[in-house]
From Swiss-Prot:
The gene is TRM3. Interacts with the terminase subunits TRM1 and TRM2. Interacts with portal protein. This is Tripartite terminase subunit 3. One of its GO terms (biological process) is chromosome organization. Signal peptide: none annotated. A motif (Walker B motif) lies at residues 352-357. It comes from Human herpesvirus 1 (strain 17). One of its GO terms (cellular component) is host cell nucleus. The active site is at 357 (for atpase activity), 509 (for nuclease activity), 581 (for nuclease activity), 707 (for nuclease activity).
Length: 735
């Protein structure tokens, strides 16, 4: 009791002496304080004040009382507060990017700004006039000085200093003291870049370090947790991080999903060992999916502590606990357990609980671990590879989209491009990210093909951690936004005929198969609208029989649809180019073309039009294999893939539209022709052969027909091609 009272009296006496010293110092000592390592806590109060109400004032140690708008200037706020801890940043972390000694030299400021500020002269206030400002200044200053004097903050500073030393030697230092020899590099670590001779951290490793450090600082420093944020922003080089982002690192659970062989467990070993050796009285838990996975970690941590501090301060129970002793008698402890025996961590009081390979731990072990969420001073850090082979080894993916943003996924493929990378066997990353892939990682197309030779989709499941393609699951290729635009935006072609090209393209996909209900006849009439393509007519129908008068019936429907388009746009078109597909029946295709030619000329003649006044009617002609005669039909062979690719590109970019005055004698009776076409387009899928990378397109999904879709795609393809002169020609040439 007497000792406690004596300690309290001594502390009060020290505070009185400190206050007296602050009252005696003058503004002339300010410059001397700034030159002593750039530590703003040594700068006395400067006799100046801001002419603003007290509620709008803020105090910045080393600067003074300012308008609180300065708090909302990220550059000023970061620079001013970084001066508070500049002398405490380890030399290994200085001179990197924006921080360290560069701050004291103002190297990040424009020379013109430095010269302008140097010319400013401030009016010195009388000491009696700035008593409130002086009191407020020293009140804030005393808070930061109390932080500096606290034992917990010293432990944090030592942790940062020692971690910087470990980073310098790539975590292979035999001692935590400074060494003058060359840094020891592990054989697999990435080579030094930009002239650096120290090791570097992967981004996810730095994130794990920040999560652990921020939480331990909040637990150990208590009331000073807010002030220490400035120091940690300086250490981690995140001066512009918002307060919300900083609070993210204090949350009591976080999950990291990292591809295989990226240094997850390798990084946890020095982090845990140094935490035990730096923070007095903390307790750490470590659990993995099997005991064989915890034993190497136990041995590595034990070896690190003994190598740094000797065996006298390290005590352990084989495979279960490691205790580290401090000179004052306090101890820090780590407890190990596997998911098969999580009773070892029940009843413990952890500050950090690391769950390694969390995707593979037993469900009952997850329940035990979740119990620690009820402990206010415990943080659970889940670290696992991103296996997606089955739900039981991918349950952490369920955290995606959570409001508290628990999940951190390290990936080389974004969600949008994952389906495309899955279908392309040589791809191992998408173009969205430029990641620093470790040099000890071999991840290319050859590795992917080799892995998939042993077991299908093993690369995407086990190595990269992406979503594996389900069997028979083809990928849709048209975007939802493009489909909505196609459905809603329909320009009027009757009032904008001057924007259209003078040629119409008609594609007929006749049905001549035994299954008359599954395969119908599709007809599309398209043209050019500025640089885009526009659909004027759509027809889709099924015939009762495909013999006898079927060619004449198909031709009659084509003619009726075409003449309606011409009637709605009088004088707008000078040519009509018709292509009749002949893959099913070349004889029927020739018959359809002949009937269209005859019927069109009969209708034009009945209207009293001259042969030269109407649009020129041309038919696609091709030369079948083994023949020297051109026939009026179109053979669809190798043109299908480029035609579909051209259509997909134009459709997704908004280059395919439907006319507001669209014509349809067969579809409009049932539904909107554009909606009807869009239903077929939504069935369009792309399949890539896993061995040859050959793409095939199909619209026959779930038994749906694709005749109208094929007719539209091929009509647009023909409208975009500049074929040879004889490609389109009249059936009866005009002499």
């Amino acid at each position: 009791m007497f000792g406690q009272q004596l300690a309290s009296d001594v502390q009060q006496y020290l505070e009185r002496l400190e206050k007296q010293r602050q009252l005696k110092v003058g503004a002339d000592e300010a410059s001397a304080g700034l030159t002593m390592g750039g530590d703003a806590l040594r700068v006395p109060f400067l006799d100046f004040a801001t002419a603003t109400p007290k509620r709008h004032q803020t105090v910045v140690p080393g600067v003074g009382t300012l308008h609180d708008c300065c708090e909302h200037s990220p550059l000023f706020s970061a620079v001013a507060r970084r001066l508070l801890f500049n002398s405490l940043v380890p030399a290994q972390l200085k001179g990197r990017d924006f921080g360290g000694d560069h701050t004291a030299k103002l190297e990040f400021l424009a020379p013109e700004l430095v010269r302008a500020v140097a010319r400013l002269r401030f009016k010195e206030c009388a000491p009696a006039d700035v008593v409130p400002q002086r009191n407020a200044y020293y009140s804030v200053l005393n808070t930061f000085q109390a932080l500096h004097r606290s034992e917990a903050f010293r432990q944090l500073v030592h942790f940062v200093r020692d971690f910087a030393q470990l980073l310098k030697t790539s975590f292979r230092a035999s001692s935590l003291t400074e060494t003058t020899g060359p840094p020891k590099k592990r054989a697999k670590v990435d080579v030094a870049t930009h002239g650096r001779t120290y090791g570097t951290l992967e981004l996810f490793q730095k994130m794990i370090l920040m999560h652990a450090t921020y939480f331990l600082a909040a637990v150990l420093l208590g009331d000073h947790a807010e002030q220490v944020n400035t120091f940690l922003r300086l250490v981690f080089e995140i001066p512009l991080f918002s307060d919300a982002a900083v609070r993210h690192f204090r949350q009591r659970a976080t999950v990291f999903l990292v591809p295989r062989r990226h240094g997850k467990t390798w990084f946890l070993v020095p982090l845990i060992a140094l935490s035990l050796a730096s923070f007095r009285g903390i307790k750490i838990g470590y659990t993995a999916h099997i005991r064989k996975a915890t034993e190497p970690v136990f041995e590595e941590i034990d070896a690190c502590l003994r190598g740094w501090f000797g065996s006298a301060r390290v005590d352990h129970v084989k495979g279960e606990t490691i205790s580290f002793s401090f000179p004052d008698g306090s101890r820090s402890t780590i407890v190990f357990a596997s998911s098969h025996n999580t009773n070892g961590i029940r009843g413990q009081d952890f500050n950090l609980l690391f769950v390694d390979e969390a995707n593979f731990i037993r469900p009952d072990a997850v329940q035990t671990i979740m119990g620690f969420l009820n402990q206010a001073n415990c943080k659970i850090i889940f670290v696992s590879s991103t296996n997606t082979g089955k739900a039981s080894t991918s349950f952490l993916y369920n955290l995606r989209g959570a409001a508290d943003e628990l999940l951190n996924v390290v990936t080389y493929i974004c969600d949008d491009h994952m389906p495309r990378v899955v279908t392309h066997t040589n791809a191992t990353a998408c173009s969205c990210y430029i990641l620093n892939k470790p040099v000890f990682i071999t991840m290319d197309g050859a590795v992917r093909r080799t892995a998939d030779l042993f077991l299908a989709d093993s690369f995407m499941q086990e190595i990269i951690g992406g979503q594996a393609r389900e069997t028979g699951d083809d990928r849709p290729v048209l975007t939802k936004s493009a489909g909505e635009r196609f459905l809603l935006y329909r320009p009027s072609t009757t009032t904008n005929s001057g924007l259209m090209a003078p040629d119409l393209y008609v594609y007929v996909d006749p049905a001549f198969t035994a299954n008359t209900r599954a395969s119908g006849t599709g007809v599309a009439v398209v043209g050019r609208y500025r640089d885009d393509y526009i659909i004027f007519a759509l027809e889709h129908f099924f015939l009762r029989a495909l013999t006898g008068s079927a060619p004449a019936d198909i031709a009659r429907c084509v003619v009726h649809s075409l003449t309606q388009v011409l009637a709605l746009h009088p004088g707008a078109f000078r040519g009509v180019r018709v292509a009749v597909e002949g893959n099913s029946s070349q004889d029927s295709a020739v018959a359809i073309a002949t009937h269209v030619h005859t019927e069109m000329h009969r209708l034009l003649a009945s209207e009293g039009a001259d042969a030269g006044s109407g649009p020129e009617l041309l038919f696609y002609h091709c030369e079948p294999p083994g023949s020297a005669v051109l026939y009026p039909f179109f053979l669809l062979n190798k043109q299908k893939t480029p035609a579909f690719e051209h259509f997909i590109k134009k459709f997704n970019s908004g280059g395919v539209m439907a006319s507001q005055e669209i014509v349809s004698a067969t579809v409009r009776l049932q539904t909107d022709p554009v909606e009807y076409l869009l239903e077929q387009l939504n069935n369009l899928t792309e399949t890539v052969s896993p061995n040859t990378d050959v793409r095939t397109y199909s619209g026959k999904r779930n038994g749906a027909s694709d005749d109208l879709m094929v007719a539209v795609i091929m009509a647009i393809y023909l409208a975009a091609q500049a074929g040879p002169p004889h490609t389109f020609a009249p059936i009866t040439r005009v002499s």
